[in-house]
Amino acid sequence: MNLPNKLTILRVCMIPFFVMTLLFDHGNSQFMRVIADLIFIFASLTDLLDGKIARKYNLVTNFGKFMDPLADKLLVCSALICLIELGQIPAWVVIVIISREFIISGFRLVASDNGVVIAASYWGKFKTVFQMLTVILMILNLPALAMVTSLLLMIAVALTIISLVDYVVKNRRVLTEGGM
């Protein structure tokens, strides 16, 4: 197993520690929120690092193409669900984001059944970056950054929808060739 794939697996393994830390004392401990944020930031940076290493050293694998975006989904969605629990994000936002992830995962499964691996799109990458930045600020829950956080959240939701449309349009052949 190569280094980028190990970083992807590390990101997934960090999720339970992140969740436990963020939800400690129902999110009332600012110290634990900072620790949770640091875990989230480190996990997010492994996403950036694994992709750069894979491309630079020609270590791109089908496992990485499939697992890297899945690890991102798991990290971001677990954070968003925790933020619902803490009363910091409307449930409808998380429903939109998670619905998009299920739809894209469905596309990937159909493609995989046909021997096709679909890599993440640029819109999907932008979406992930904005979701991660939004989560980082929401975890800190700083009143001074409330407007910036709200703006980032709106951009993240818009990019979620745009990336879904882009993905469906670019990969509609998967549905027609997949017998749907």
Across the structure, where does each feature detected by a protein language model lie?
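Alpha-helical transmembrane bundles and membrane-interface segments of multipass inner-membrane proteins
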Residues: 1-180
